[in-house]
């Protein structure tokens, strides 16, 4: 994976202090089906991390309110740095004082159906529809 894709991610983490994947090892192969991961993250404030596989990384957003089964409910998703694909299996505790310090739980994961293009990630706000297969 080209270093530039994860440069912001790597700059924020001290991998000698955290068990989070650095993304510097052997690159995990992209899947044929686009994966998504939702992680419950009890950091400074409880939130959920939404990660969508695209172009060899997880594009990532922090969602401050929990997921809802009602499609009429709206949730603000704030884009954060891309994460390595290995982060899709991460659960554990990030040490206090480190970026994102707190407990990360794997809340849901699956694959997405339908075609989507790079322009889907341009701009500040996007509506994402996922269906578990």
For each feature predicted by the language model, list its residue ranges:
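A charge-rich, low-complexity, intrinsically flexible signal that marks solvent-exposed coils, linkers
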Residues: 1-133
